[in-house]
Amino acid sequence: MTRYFLGVSQEEFPPEALLEQAVAAEQAGFDGISSSDHLQPWWEPGESGHTWPWLGAAGAATAKVPFGTGVTSTGARYHPALIAQAWVTLERMFPGRPFLGIGSGEALNEVPVGDDWPSVGDQIARMDEALSIMDRLWKGETLTEEGRFYTCTDLKLHTLSERRPPLWISAFGPKAAEVAARWGDGLWTLPDPESTPSLLEGWRDAGGSGDVIFQALFSWAPDADEALETVRKWKGAQPQEHYKEDWHEPRKMYAHGEEQMSDEEFERSAIIASDPGEIVARIRELEELGPTVIVLQNNSGPHALEAIELFGREVLPALRGA
């Protein structure tokens, strides 16, 4: 049976509001909570709370639900040791609950701290190297090495956990899917009826197994037009070049997204609705592609808490056949 996680957006809401959403999500019956990990939003003005301290607060404010990053990037912001250390810290405080989503990142979050944004091939190679470092640190190894992207000198984790993280790796193409197969317990992607089947086939052919995680934006409001206007700013996150190339200025990214994507295209790629039945139908379409987890990213603006309550009252019971 598919599990349904709430995705909370550090780019859109202040951290205290997201904490309310996390508590409401557990009460509504969501199966987990996924937090974005951004230095900057995709537009201005936006938000940019730090996901790692927020996750500690979310773990303390909730009782049982799994929680983690969706996703953390392997770039200039974080040496892999910091990611490995942060995850172990959460696991020691909330055993059995944290997961870790990993991706190759965006220039949006790396260039402002001094990264020279690499080619797509090097983005993936850097993620591969970072995952190798984290894997060995979680095993208790001490590392001294000069890699292509990271340096380690007598590096080890002095606090370890019994459990390794459920590691879900973001992939949109065959090279990243191979990395996900090599290191991950699942593949995280944005569902697309045309490209997702071949992506999953390539991942499995490379030895990948485990969870298939789909992430989807949703915006609910009492009026469908309001739901669209509320989520419109997320067009800045849609163009593929914003991930592949050096786009790092939020205002320009939003303007470019608005130019590149019509409202009709956006409504096909995101779940934008006032009718809970339409939301259920759209999620059912995603399920036809075979996910085990769907992360429903709540971009409902001023109606965010109402949307979570609606999911608990109508959407999740319908999806589960209650």
Residue ranges, per PLM feature:
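Active-site-adjacent structural elements that line small-molecule/cofactor binding pockets in enzymes
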Residues: 1-322
